[in-house]
């Protein structure tokens, strides 16, 4: 089973379900956590991520990172993803915006470039400075700005 990228009982159990929710993948081959969690995984190697905040470009890049990690684990191409934005307004039902994403070579390179920049900051112990614009929900906002 290990030759198919199934390195745990959880991986084997998850393959028995057609629509997999919260699939754990090993990102350590890419220098990431060994317990990455994608929100959902559909047959045909389609990654699905649910978001409740506003749409951001980095969401697509993160999806490419998940695809690379999954590919390194399974040796099966993962070229498609879906970002589903959930809006909870005053309306009686949530509004869903579904964004299909082609995970192409450019998006993969964008992820690798960002990963390499982050690793260089950590390895060189270089202070990246204060961001030009902070995300309103950043957990480090008080620490950086003071």
What does each model-identified segment do?
Residues 120-146:
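Cysteine-cluster motifs in flexible loop/terminal segments that predominantly coordinate metals
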């Amino acid at each position: 089973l290990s030759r198919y990228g199934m390195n745990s009982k959880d991986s084997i159990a998850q393959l028995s379900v057609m629509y997999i929710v919260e699939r754990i993948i090993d990102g350590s081959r890419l220098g990431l956590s060994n317990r990455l969690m994608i929100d959902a995984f559909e047959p045909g190697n389609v990654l699905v991520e649910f978001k409740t905040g506003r749409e951001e470009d980095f969401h697509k890049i993160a999806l490419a990172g998940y695809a690379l990690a999954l590919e390194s684990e399974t040796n099966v191409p993962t070229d498609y993803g879906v970002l589903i934005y959930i809006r909870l307004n005053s309306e009686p039902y949530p509004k869903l915006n579904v964004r299909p994403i082609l995970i192409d070579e450019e998006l993969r390179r964008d992820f690798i470039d960002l990963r390499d920049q982050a690793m260089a900051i950590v390895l060189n112990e270089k202070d990246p400075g204060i961001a030009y614009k902070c995300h309103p929900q950043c957990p480090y906002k008080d620490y950086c700005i003071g």
